Regions:
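Active-site core segments that coordinate phosphate-bearing ligands/cofactors
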Residues: 1-24, 32-236, 241-340
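N-terminal beta-strand-loop-alpha-helix module at the start
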Residues: 29
Length: 340
């Protein structure tokens, strides 16, 4: 149910307004995974399907947004597990053992479908800038009359990044197509910058843009993992960044200093996760938790392909982030001096 302490604090804050209600009276009822949310009515069926083919009486489970369905789709509903969805935007969710010690504006608090507390880091930008650079390389190849398969091009360039310096050799990139609240950037301007003596080569160029795709996420996660000392046994990755086997997965493992698993089913996404939650409501055994149902009946013990963090990669990403933070003013100044 709702946090009673927060409910009481809110009601106390509005005491002088003389509203004819208490906040809990106007909030919807809380339902957790496995509970019944009712059945589809005749009126509802007609609204959804005026043709009349959709029948009333269909059982409904509690609805979830992208966060809850993503947790179900990646089997990351247990304490000390989490998932990272990396595509146009990127977010990470970690299921907590206990409440955080402090309030952090970089972190959002949500719950699993079963009601366990989850810390979330959400960033507006991830692969858009990276994709734009890959598109530029395709244009270069086409200028020589070479038709390049995009999947092959992504694979070649991503794997080339693995040959780069662990700290990207003096290159930095900010992938901000839009602002990033985590770093206090109100607007975004994609930016690539390097030192005059940087090791400027293709491997470092690709590595810095892969780092940039996860850099803001890492800043938020460092608060969670290093300041709050939250423990994570395993993270499940899903989304476009992980399509090239072992590359995005390894870089995320370095960013978090934690094992990262990628399952073949991870690409199924939210709709499949919602279907799993509906299936749990209908098929769960007495006393069977969502965690048990997913692990035993859906995923069957399958943990996916797991990559452990490489200590050298972890140290390299940490060094990159130190330089990234120090130069953040250049990104903010670019937004100020290049109005849209």
């Amino acid at each position: 149910d709702y946090d009673e302490e927060m409910i009481e604090k809110f009601d106390k804050l509005i005491e002088g307004e003389n509203y004819p209600w208490k906040v809990k009276e106007i909030m919807p009822k809380v339902l957790v995974a496995g509970e019944s949310a009712g059945t589809l009515t005749e009126e509802g069926a007609k609204l959804l399907d005026p043709s009349g083919n959709l029948e009333a009486g269909i059982p409904l489970c509690p609805p979830e947004g992208d966060a809850g369905t993503g947790m179900a789709a990646t089997n990351s509903v247990a304490v000390r597990t989490g998932n990272v969805s990396a595509g146009t935007s990127v977010f990470a969710m970690v299921v907590l053992e206990e409440d955080l010690k402090a309030v952090h504006e970089e972190l959002d608090m949500v719950t699993t479908p079963s009601g366990d507390t989850v810390a979330m880091v959400h960033c507006n930008n991830c692969t858009s800038d990276l994709n734009a650079w890959v598109g530029l390389f395709r244009e270069f190849a086409e200028n020589f009359g070479i038709n390049v398969d995009m999947n092959e091009l992504f694979g070649k360039l991503y794997n080339k990044a693995l040959e780069g310096d662990k700290d990207c050799g003096g290159l930095l990139a900010y992938n901000y197509f839009s602002g990033e609240p985590v770093t206090g950037a109100n607007e975004g301007r994609p930016l690539f910058v390097r030192k005059p003596d940087a090791h400027f080569n293709l491997a470092n160029f690709m590595r810095t843009h892969l780092y940039a795709a996860l850099a803001t996420l890492k800043i938020g996660l460092d608060i969670l993992l290093k300041e709050e000392k939250v423990k994570v046994d395993r993270i499940y990755g899903h989304g476009g960044l992980f399509k090239t086997k072992g590359v995005g997965q390894g870089i995320l493992a370095a960013a978090m200093d934690a094992p990262v698993a990628v399952m073949e089913t991870a690409g199924e996404g939210g709709p499949w996760g919602m279907a799993l939650l509906a299936s749990y409501m209908l098929q769960k055994a007495d006393g069977e938790s969502l965690e048990q149902y997913l692990s035993e009946k859906v995923f069957g013990g399958e943990s996916g392909s797991v990559m452990e963090p490489d200590p050298a990669d972890v140290a390299g990403f940490d060094a990159y982030i130190k330089a990234y933070k120090a130069a953040l003013a250049t990104e903010k100044e670019a937004a100020r001096t290049m109005p849209l």
